[in-house]
Swiss-Prot record:
Keywords: Glycoprotein, Membrane, Signal, Transmembrane, Transmembrane helix. It is found in: Membrane. Glycans are attached at residues 117, 240, 335. Residues 1-24 form the signal peptide. The chain crosses the membrane at residues 390-414. This is Glycoprotein GX. GO terms for cellular component: membrane.
Length: 444
């Protein structure tokens, strides 16, 4: 789509013009596992009182902006920037970290954790801090879509996960440092096997459409790149992992009167439990303006360690239907993904983003798939307020730079003209002195 291509590249170019950092890294392959792991540092204490933050508290403090790009069926990491804290992360008894997704004036909380007794010099993590708390993550009545890897956000981006992600480091209620990552998802939903016609935006107004089956001709290029973990029997391996460890609602919370869970397909095509009729339905969007990180149906505290939560994100690949070409097995897809992931990637900050987005989503113009097109409003500007605001700010800065350059050119031209005129007068005066007959003709 020309409009989508123009809007996406314009957003990246203008963010670069404004001096944003450029990030672009898929998660390491060793994070793509579906078995139950409880390695690394376990939570040393429950999550303490969270910072009472409003959406405006974060948006008004954003000091570092970055761009990230995701293609295909990637397991992605969105990174915090160490420069978000002037002078670098400091030593502290408690450091709060959190991530949220911005949707206009409200935000969707995604992850929150506390680190204890940190030495500073680097972002909080298991090598910098003596302990960590339980993690509060978005999941609720659905699947495990997010996890934290240190301070980085782990997710499997779909088309509707594009947008602006806000993060913060907190050293106290009035000592908060905020940055943002704008995620561009440049992937053709009809080319990849993982069902990219999904994402957080589906619960925030967008509607997904049906995907056509992949053909053998589609299985070319980077179609297999991404996270496809080794096969495990999910029901058996994860059967002893409690919902509380993963930050999910216990099945008994949304069982029907007979004690069985009734699973329905919602408009986005994802499975969700049916709540008892006398209980209010959960707010699936959970987009807030105040109390961003307080617990809710969709944002619960997970008791499990970091490795367990990361595995829960990756194992969901094995529980959803994959759109494979006829005759292709999952094992063949996994082998192809390992080969694809091992290919050298483009290096250099600007190259990562530009190369990732030169072939953006080319969604077919079919009546039944019209809703999958990226949304662009007046003059081709995106409907997303945050992206639109960034583009307009970038245009304003570019215009000011152009006007300033024009003023400099005009000043230089005026000075040159005056110098030339003075030189002509000097030559005329010299000529008149040496030729008295011409002196009456001299005008000064």
């Amino acid at each position: 789509m020309p409009a989508a291509r123009t809007g996406t590249l314009a957003a990246v170019a203008l963010i670069l013009l404004c001096g944003a950092a450029v990030l672009g890294r898929p998660a390491p392959d060793d994070l793509c596992f579906a078995d139950v792991r409880r390695t690394g540092m376990a939570p040393s204490r429950p999550l303490g009182p969270v910072l009472n933050l409003a959406a405006s508290d974060l948006t008004s403090r954003v000091s570092v902006r970055a761009v990230d790009a995701s293609r295909g069926c990637a397991l992605a990491l969105l990174d915090m920037a160490e420069t978000v804290v002037p002078g670098g992360p400091r030593a502290a008894d408690v450091v709060d970290v959190g991530w949220a997704y911005q949707d206009g004036d409200c935000m969707v909380p995604l992850a929150y954790r506390q680190y204890f007794n940190c030495t500073g010099g680097a972002l909080p993590g298991q090598n910098v801090c003596a302990g960590l708390s339980e993690t509060r993550i978005r999941g609720g009545f659905g699947t495990s879509d997010y996890a934290l890897y240190g301070t980085s956000l782990v997710l499997r981006p779909g088309l509707y996960d594009r947008g602006t992600y806000i993060y913060f480091l907190g050293y106290g209620p009035d000592d908060i440092y905020v940055g943002s990552v704008t995620l561009m998802v440049g992937a053709d939903i009809h080319k990849y096997p993982c069902g990219l016609d999904r994402g957080l935006g589906v619960a925030l107004h967008h509607k997904s459409g049906p995907a056509r089956p992949l053909t053998e001709d589609d299985a070319t290029g980077d179609w297999a790149c991404g996270c496809f973990p080794a096969v495990v029997e999910v029901d058996v391996v994860w059967g002893n992992v409690s919902a509380a460890e993963l930050g999910l609602a216990d099945p008994i919370d949304y069982a029907d009167e007979g004690g069985e869970v009734e699973v329905l397909e919602d408009e986005a095509g994802s499975a969700s439990g049916n709540l008892p009729q006398d209980d209010p339905d959960p707010d699936l969007a959970d987009c807030r303006t105040v109390g961003l990180f307080s617990e809710s149906d969709m944002f619960r505290t997970a008791r499990g360690p970091e490795s367990l939560l990361i595995g829960a994100v990756a194992k969901d690949v094995l529980t959803v239907p994959l759109n494979l070409p006829p005759g292709r097995s999952y094992e063949a897809l996994r082998n192809a993904s390992l080969e694809c992931n091992s290919r050298p990637r483009e290096t250099g900050d600007a190259a990562v983003v530009v190369m990732s987005l030169q072939e953006p989503a080319r969604l077919e113009r079919r009546p039944d798939a019209r809703a999958t097109d990226p949304e662009f409003g007046l003059f081709g500007l995106p409907d997303d307020p945050a992206v639109r605001r960034g583009i307009l700010i970038g245009l304003a800065i570019a215009l000011l730079v152009l006007l300033f350059s024009l003023v400099i050119v005009l000043v230089c031209a005026c000075r040159l003209a005056r110098a030339a005129k003075a030189a002509r007068r000097a030559r005329a005066a010299t000529f008149a002195k040496s030729n008295p007959a011409y002196e009456p003709m001299l005008r000064v």
